[in-house]
Amino acid sequence: MDKYLIANINMFSLNNQVFLVDDLTREPCQIGAYSLADLPQALVQIAYDNDINIIKIAGNNKYSEKISDEIAIQENLLFREKKIKVEVI
């Protein structure tokens, strides 16, 4: 099991929590909270900084797919490669 990020999308909140789940503890640890506008770039940067390949988006709502698409765009703009797998849970 690899470490991964979980982004908790709440369309009624100004800040959406981001958690890191690592191999050893399997317990989520909050590492930040971001607006919907800043979330895709923040997730990509955190993933690359921590060598994470999986981002899970919790909160299956209309913003989940938009955030998923924006993550792919930000990853391409920032790093010119595709290594992050995004799952909507």
Where do the language-model regions lie?
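Residue-level signature for short turns and capping positions that connect secondary-structure elements
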Residues: 25-26, 62
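N-terminal basic/disordered segments at the start of proteins
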Residues: 2-14
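A short, exposed loop/beta-hairpin motif centered on an aromatic-Gly-Thr core
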Residues: 26-37
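Long, charge-rich, low-complexity alpha-helical segments
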Residues: 37-88
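Short aromatic-glycine-(Arg/Gly/Cys) micro-motifs in beta-strand/loop hairpins
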Residues: 14-24
